[in-house]
Amino acid sequence: MTLDPITCPDGMQQTLGALLYEGLLVLDESFAPQNVLCSRYEHNDDCTSYTFYLRDGVSFSDGSILTASDVLATLRRAQESERYSARFANVASMRASNGALIVNLTRADSAFPALFDIPIVKSGSEKNTVPLGTGPYLFVTDSDGACLKQNPDWHSDGTLPFERIELRAVKDADTASYLFSSREVHLLSADLTSSTGDLRSADTALTDYATANMIYLGFNTQRAPLSDASLRSALAGAIDRATITTGYLAGHAEAAHFPLSPHSSLYPTEMASTLASPDLAAALESAGVTESRPRTVTILVSESDSFKVSIADYLSRTLSTDVLTVSVRSLPWNDYLTALQNGNFDLYLGEVRLTANWDISSLARTGGTLNYGRYADEQCNTLLDAFSLNETDQTARALYRYLAQSAPIAPIAFKTASVLTPSGLIDGLNPTVSSPFYGIEGWTVHFDKG
């Protein structure tokens, strides 16, 4: 199975690839981009054109020098890939020029560099089972089997904690989990809200890290009574996010009132604690839902995710009132998606992997590709544009305050992922959404604990 970071499956291959490949940038704990293969970048006044200058002296694991053409070739493949294509929705053109990559956008995006933590491989090697990368380790097969060894051409001056990393071939995530439990594997990266078993134990260290995966409740804004913005806002405010994150997502999520990670420096924490939602009873009456005219609305959810089905059931119980009954309809994934695309729903429980520039145009802009609720609001479009042009605390607060009031969606939580190791084995573990091995040069390994 290929280790090409553009086309490999999600999961174990990506974890391994984080040691073999690097991007122009990497995202830190707050989703801020840090330079890796580029030394610096600049943009024009309206943030519609970016130039990324490559770092000098970077070579692939075969000793060949990294070029802008290599970067361009990988990004062109990423543009057509299922995993990364959404990041290029705003890209008009890309070209390599004199050791730099020039990217032109269709509209302003002051946070565009946060999208370029895409792993780069040497052009022409992408069809290899293990394409060539610039990362701290390289893949080798010797008399003892497949392993990773330190890349002697790695560009960093940092000291790596392992000379050799043994690899074990596994057929699926369950097998990997078993091997970790039996300590035949010493590091595992996992989404524990999707795990079939509990990998936690007294001798296991678990380090969670923030992701951009948002769980949210979507509203059909074209169908009464949810066409009423005050009612949508009241329902959003009535969601007990703390109970959902701790009780239904096993603690591997963080409550969020706005569509960006609470770890982002732009997250308006103070506004989240002071924002007042409309009174639900008053909002129902204003929307025409009364004792004489009770209503039933239904939450659509995919039956393939037991965590989300449980959350939907909880929402149905806690959002129902004497005059509003909230029911749940679970559907197979394809039927669920078809119903969303056809607008055949009242509410739906969804999950989306946002990009780290926190552009939610697909969800909230008129005609957005994921705007299943047919929300259309010119003021929201204007605020989205202002935020994209200049991501500041001021533009963020203006946008998120308006979204809380008009409530096309109700953010619930951002999931966390987990890195599991034997207790006491590694000090300094600091995984991020870009890499579970972020800052590996700073690790201290206690080999007697393995």
Give the label of every model feature segment.
Residues G237, A253-A287, D305-K308:
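Structural transition elements
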Residues N104-E166, D172-D174:
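Gly/Pro-rich hinge or "lid" segments in bacterial periplasmic/extracellular proteins
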Residues S327-Y336, S361-L425, K449-G450:
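Extracytoplasmic/peripheral linker and loop segments enriched in polar/acidic and small residues
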Residues A287-L354:
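Ligand/substrate-recognition segments at binding pockets and active sites
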Residues Q222-S264, Y400-P408:
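Periplasmic-binding protein-like
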Residues V140-C147, E166-R223, E351:
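Extracellular/periplasmic solute-recognition and catalytic clefts
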Residues P422-G450:
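Long beta-strand-rich cores associated with HINT superfamily self-processing modules
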Residues M1-D45, R76, L132:
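N-terminal lobe/hinge region of extracytoplasmic solute-binding protein
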